Amino acid sequence: MALKAICIGINDYPGNQNDLHGCVNDANDWARELGRRGFEVSTLLDKKATGAEIRKRIESLVTSATPGDTLVVQFSGH
């Protein structure tokens, strides 16, 4: 039974009125804690966290799962 997670954090949005300040930190904190608990964790942060890449990574996470696996998708952003 595998433990797998993806942690996504987006601070920077187009323009500067919609920017956030703690989302990347949140994703990194989650990733660190899940890693301590035995999860295999990947992260997507800021510009690397495009809609297409998020969908691709979640699909990969789900399709690689087998019965009994635990999956976590954590998102911090708008």
Labelled PLM ranges:
Residues 1-78:
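Boundary/activation segment at the start of structured domains
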